Amino acid sequence: MCRPSGYAVYLWHCDAQGRYSLYSSGVTGENYLRGVSATDSSGNVTFTTIFPGCYSGRWPHMHFEVYRSLSAATSVSNKIATSQLGFAKAVCDTVYAQSAYSGSATNLAQISYASDGIFQGNAGQVATTSGSVSAGYTASITVGVSV
């Protein structure tokens, strides 16, 4: 949640195979699973996307940056905060049982939230998640940003 309203949040994450558009081999010319949205009058921001895959060495996560406005979000030098949100293992296990996420279950088995070099077990970065594979999931997290 960002107050006042109108702050921009840039969110990006990897695909079901653990690849990042623009950066990973085979998808450097593609731009997907990235988006910017402005906070509403309650300071909330919403994105519709897929559950991120799990790649070797990292716990499943989404990256985000916060900017003072949508126009400020055009340059990384304007960001006022950068962080990530992670997901509970039970949700990851359920999603990664689906065929589209075939490699993610193997990668997840090789890491823990506590051993991830970024999260290091920080429970404050785990999103609250509800839903199901068939209906879709909703993840939410409250983030404090000093401005």
Residue ranges and their predicted role:
Residues I111-G124:
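Glycine-aromatic-enriched beta-strand/loop faces of beta-sandwich-type recognition domains
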Residues G124-V147:
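C-terminal, well-folded lobe of enzymatic/effector domains
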Residues M1-Q110, A114, S146-V147:
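Beta-strand-dominated extracellular/periplasmic modules and repeats
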